[in-house]
């Protein structure tokens, strides 16, 4: 069988050579035994350092190295979609370009695939993570699994192996706003989860900071359910009920006050501020959904290819 290793890159010039050497060594060791052939597909997601030049050098030295360069940074989700679309292996394994996904896991994932699993997922431990990072991650999974239409498992990373059948299902979904962790779960198929210890980044800095993590979390929650909209409706009815009770309470005070009734100025101001804030939050939630619809109806491509050594990708590229 042929295995494709899919790696998305963004400014990874400091670690790319080390990553390629480690993964290539592992694949070469499997060649002729577990594998009949392999390819390593690099997606350069708009790097502005020497990442692409290094990829070109690797491709000149080894015809098993394939690459696609985007015209700008389209994001990891688009990079993985492009890789799935143009990879030619019987199965495709997604790995990080910084060696946080250990290459020694490749044979374990391949063995699970040969056992009949269409999806093999890596689940990392949280050993060594910062308290803030691990707390945020656990909070995200707690909230998402109570609001989303799919179940996400804490620790499941982008380290995945998909069969050709699973890949075809994945790329058949045309939505522009993609949340891969949810899409992997949505397509279903027989899955095996392999736990592993996440390695430290070998060089360079992470491109997925707190802000991107927050945006990614919001993207996931918005993409896979409409419950925030229902919460707005439910809270609206609750507020209506409370308002009716408050009016009834004030009416009783007026009736039994015998002319000494004085309206609550501070209560009124507090209520106005409270409900104004709630309205702004709900308008923001509506805006998020409307914004997603806005991007969906444009039907823009998920990515634009600037350069590639894959013939089919050349044919599909603009210009």
Language model features by range: what are they?
Residues 11-14, 100, 104, 171, ...:
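Residues in soluble alpha-helical coiled-coils and helical-bundle/repeat scaffolds
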Residues 35-36, 120-122, 152-155, 179, ...:
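Short, hydrophobic secondary-structure boundary micro-motifs
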Residues 1-129:
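Structured catalytic core of nucleotide-sugar glycosyltransferases
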Residues 70-72, 76-86, 102-183, 199-218:
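Acceptor/aglycone-binding surface of glycosyltransferases and processive sugar-polymer synthases
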